[in-house]
Amino acid sequence: MPLTRGRIVGYDDERLAFGFTMLNDGETVDCQISDAAMDELAGVRGSPSTARQGQFLEHRDAIENIASRLFDASRPVKGAVVRIFTKHIPAFRRDTGTRSW
């Protein structure tokens, strides 16, 4: 079952990732997308950390779709974080027939 939209957590300077939550039957699922994965999805390189929230909002539907697919493909463990890395972007594009955003 697909996850549903949660809230924006924001940028984590230590992990170089943008955090957000999604919901699974009312339970919060923590999610993150790496800087590199977000740039890959957007078709750019080296975006500054100050641009991450705007970048996330612009590509939110795709990012949440990827997180939901990763969650559904795994054996969810309570408290585990769904992490999106660059390796997940080509598979998403292949599955959706999308070349770039």
PLM regions with names:
Residues M1-L3, C31-Q32, T50-G54:
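A generic short-segment signal for beta-strand/edge and adjacent turn/coil regions
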Residues G19-V44:
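A short, structured beta-strand/loop element
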Residues R5-R7, D25-I33, R75-T86:
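Short, exposed beta-strand "edge-strand" segments with a Pro/Gly-rich flavor and a Y/T-containing core
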Residues V44-W101:
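Acidic, low-complexity intrinsically disordered segments
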Residues M1-E27:
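Short, charged/polar N-terminal "headpieces" of proteins
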Residues V9, A36-D39, G54, V82:
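Flexible, active-site-adjacent loop/turn segments at secondary-structure boundaries
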